[in-house]
Amino acid sequence: MEQARQVKISKFLSKHLRHTPERLGLVLAPGGWVAVDELLSACASHQFPISRADLEQVVSNNDKQRFSFDETATKIRANQGHSVEVDLQLQPQLPPPILYHGTGEKSVPAILKSGLLKMSRHHVHLSKDIETARTVGIRHGKPVIFSVDAMVMYQSGFTFYCSDNGVYLVDHVPPEYLHMMN
């Protein structure tokens, strides 16, 4: 499958598995799962046919690992980034000492004042490495990277989760745990 087609499918899946499942007539089960057959049927009935092979290729080749299959490969979900109410059934995790967050330069004043807020999402997304954070930041303009004192936050009572694709999730990062790197 061509790269352009993979990107188009990935964007379509992101939109409907994270934000608007109801537009395809889908209901996310606990954990954010939806039956693969149900998804493929819904896509076809909404003039966006996807084959099982296409779906498998998008899941396995997505560099950000946005999606995953369950153990039986009969269900699929978006790993994080939902704006719709969903319980991903993630377990609390001990974070590494430092995590990173990439953003655009225009967001810096608000972040320095209020910290990192989840906005329309369920969690703030944090990366394990600077390069991933920089890649995220570039999507928002000139990138700015913040380091996050994750272990200090954890020791102060904040709960961290880690999604299937290795992104750490937390409800909020107050400004006192943030350090602008660049």
From Swiss-Prot:
Pfam families registered for this protein in UniProt: PTS_2-RNA
Source organism, top-level taxon: Bacteria
A biological-process GO annotation: tRNA splicing, via endonucleolytic cleavage and ligation
Keyword set, alphabetical order: NAD, Transferase
Single Gene Ontology MF annotation: NAD+ poly-ADP-ribosyltransferase activity
Keyword Zinc in record: no
Transferase found in the keyword field: yes
Matches recorded under SUPFAM superfamilies: ADP-ribosylation (SSF56399)
EC number, as in UniProt: 2.7.1.-
Job description of the protein: Removes the 2'-phosphate from RNA via an intermediate in which the phosphate is ADP-ribosylated by NAD followed by a presumed transesterification to release the RNA and generate ADP-ribose 1''-2''-cyclic phosphate (APPR>P). May function as an ADP-ribosylase.
Family: Belongs to the KptA/TPT1 family.
Name by which UniProt lists this protein: Probable RNA 2'-phosphotransferase
Organism: Trichormus variabilis (strain ATCC 29413 / PCC 7937) (Anabaena variabilis)
Gene coding for it: kptA
